[in-house]
Swiss-Prot record:
Residues 89-151 are annotated as: Disordered. Residues 91-105, 112-151 have a biased composition (Basic and acidic residues). Coiled coil: none annotated. To C.plantagineum desiccation-related protein clone PCC3-06. This is Uncharacterized protein YtxH. Transmembrane segments: none annotated. InterPro entries: Desiccation-related_membrane, YtxH.
Length: 151
């Protein structure tokens, strides 16, 4: 037991002496005084905070821009669908009126009405799909830029 006490005592003394020697060496070999070192660390912390604030502001601005783009594209789709629906309804009414005035050509008029309605629906579908792809591309670009800002 006395050996364990001596080993612990020797270890504590060695640790204390080693700490004092290390601290003294660090003070003598430091390239700057403590005040200069604290000032440099403070200025670097301020610069880092400013850079972080700028990156946060940029990310918020880009996010706002992409939300605006998505809203514009969505409103364009809505307007496009409304316009196409109105055109289809007008064509249907026109063809119905024509078929009423000319009973002999009613089957032809119905066929024309179907074809025009299908054509208008296809056009609307194509435009909506294209706008959807545009929005998807814009969102991918936004995501890439957000990832770059996070690096």
């Amino acid at each position: 037991m006395s050996k364990d006490g001596i080993n612990s005592k020797d270890f504590l003394i060695g640790t204390l002496i080693g700490g004092i020697i290390g601290a003294t060496t660090a003070l003598f070999l430091a390239p700057k005084s403590g005040k200069e070192l604290r000032d440099d660390l403070g200025s670097q912390a301020v610069a880092l905070r400013d850079k972080t604030d700028k990156m946060t502001a940029d990310a918020k601005e880009k996010g706002t821009q992409y939300v605006s783009i998505a809203k514009d594209k969505t409103s364009n789709i809505t307007q496009l669908v409304a316009d196409q629906s109105g055109q289809i309804m007008n064509k249907v009414k026109d063809l119905r009126d024509r078929s009423k005035s000319d009973k002999t050509d009613s089957s032809t008029a119905m066929q024309d009405m179907r074809e025009e309605a299908m054509q208008a629906a296809d056009e609307t579908k194509d435009q909506v799909l294209q706008t959807k792809e545009d929005v998807k591309d814009e969102l991918k670009d936004a995501q890439k830029q957000a990832e770059q800002l996070n690096r």
